[in-house]
Design a protein with these regions (language model features):
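N-terminal loops that bind phosphate or other acidic moieties
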Residues: 1-74, 78-219
């Protein structure tokens, strides 16, 4: 069991844990362990400023220890930033029309004018598995915002604005990384973190129960 200092959905330093196999090749972690919805009382939740950066910190810690495979559980996040925070932690920079650096959040999605990947250090030669039973795509009435946004604190009168921001973000990712992250089943998981892992980092989505069966030897 590894202890790591990361950040919660609102940028506060928190310690969390994840597991590394005895041979050091496999890391198993969960987004909810650092940016979980249940970590913040309902009356204090603000998904409009929440970021997935903490997940990126946790992933980078595992990579720094030499892990070649990461299984990451998607679900229960307090965020709806489309994984913008994860990408920023791996060196991707987002700027507005004034060339001002944007802090990852729902508010920032619609302001993105330019994405700079020149200094990005995305995972290479690493297998990433998303443990995810959710098949929802990033966008649409069955997407991240409309299906899961309410439980995170997004009000009904904010939904369309947030969805437009997410669609704009999706377009900017396509321009930068030449992939439509909305195409992937599960891209809407964990507030859209799935879109970055599956689309940009070329992860594989596997249902949670299938992983349990595989690693427990159950039939």
């Amino acid at each position: 069991m590894i202890d790591v200092l990361t950040t919660d959905a609102y940028g506060k330093n928190v310690f969390t844990k994840y597991c590394i196999s005895q041979d050091g090749n496999l890391a198993v972690m969960d987004v909810a362990s650092c940016i979980g919805l249940n970590m913040t009382p309902k009356e204090k939740r603000n998904p409009m400023i929440a970021s997935s950066k903490g997940v990126g910190i946790m992933m980078k810690d595992a990579l720094s220890r030499g892990c070649k495979k990461i299984i990451i559980g998607l679900g229960g996040s307090a965020t709806n930033d489309g994984g913008m925070g994860v990408l920023s932690e791996f060196g991707v920079r987002f700027y507005n029309s004034k060339r001002e650096l944007l802090v990852p959040s729902v508010y920032a999605l619609s302001q993105i004018a330019f994405v700079d990947k020149r200094y990005a250090r995305l995972p290479k030669d690493v297998e990433i598995i998303c443990a995810c039973d959710v098949k929802n795509h990033l966008l649409g009435k069955n997407g991240a915002t409309y299906v899961f946004g309410k439980q995170k604190g997004i009000y009904l009168n904010q939904m369309s604005e947030v969805e437009r921001g997410m669609a704009h973000y999706c377009m900017k990712l396509k321009q930068t990384f030449h992939v439509n992250v909305n195409e992937f089943e599960g891209s809407g998981a964990a507030g859209g973190i799935g879109s970055v892992l599956l689309g940009v980092m070329q992860a594989k989505r596997v249902s949670g129960i299938d992983l349990v069966v595989e690693y427990s030897g159950l039939k």
